[in-house]
Amino acid sequence: MMVIEETFAIVGAGKVGTAVGIALKEAGLRVQALYDIDHRALREAADLFGVEASRSPADAAKSADAIIITTPDDMVEKVCEEVALSKFDIAGKIFIHMSGALTLEALLPAARKGAKTLCIHPIQTFADKKTAARMLKGSVFGITASDESSTNWARNFVEKIGGKSLQIRNEDRVLYHIAAVIASNFLVMIEHAAVSVFEKIGVKRDDALEALIPLVRQTVDNIQRFGVVRALTGPLARGDVGTIKAHLDSLENEPELKTLYRAVSKWGLNIARERGELEITSIDKMARLL
């Protein structure tokens, strides 16, 4: 592992910025400066990292070798441009954004001034600041860089803070982010739908979650052990047309749930075909029903 000697500035003291700052500190790397538009979040993070709160993104960036931007996506390019248009020289500095969907183009203002630019995105979900730092270790980071030297630096950086690297082409970052959204955010939406069905039959939300969480955990465990094809169970995996019809009939007065059920089940047919255990006629019957 190469030695990382750079000092860091973090612009954005939310969940991701705080987690990264803690990870840097635990790795023995120096957080030199910090900025956030939210003064309360800025003060809390500044106290946590033992640094003075900067007055602006440019003020934070001028004293560091590497600038990590962890703002909301629509602010990344604005922050980068503000720093790039400031009076001090940024040539040779490293600009990193941690957005999943944005490409290197969001950092073009800095690249035009001679800075190196990187996308380093943690494939992880951060529900709150308290657990965010712990979740970074062992996570995979989607990295994108414009040259081999920057790619090597990104890999080394990720390894230093306890993560693993997955190289993503710049033009593929939106699709890459879609995959992460489906895996994490869609899971929450699906479970919300499942809980809402329980509530319709009089089961309280807490009781519904108590019943469903073990099922969800075992399903994820099955995916890890057997893969996304072998892990599928239930009526669609069995070719149980009668049960699927009964489900759809029961959702006749619930158009949104019925649309969701059909859409997800249609994708499940792809799994059934790939699995190759059902007769084609059985899959065709389910396809017509859906």
Where are these regions (language model features)?
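Internal alpha-helical scaffold of NAD(P)-dependent oxidoreductase catalytic cores
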Residues: R30, E44-A45, T131-R225, E279
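Interdomain hinge/lid region at the active-site interface
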Residues: D221-L278
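NAD(P)+-binding Rossmann beta1-loop-alpha1 motif at the extreme N-terminus of oxidoreductases
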Residues: M1-K62
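Short beta->alpha hinge that forms the Motif I/post-I loop of the SAM-binding pocket
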Residues: I37-D38, T71, E171
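Hydrophobic Val/Ile/Leu positions in short beta-strands of Rossmann-like dinucleotide-binding domains
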Residues: A9-I10, I69, I143
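Rossmann-like NAD(P)(H) cofactor-binding subdomain of soluble oxidoreductases
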Residues: R55-T131
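NAD(P)-dependent dehydrogenase/reductase Rossmann-like domain
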Residues: A272-L290
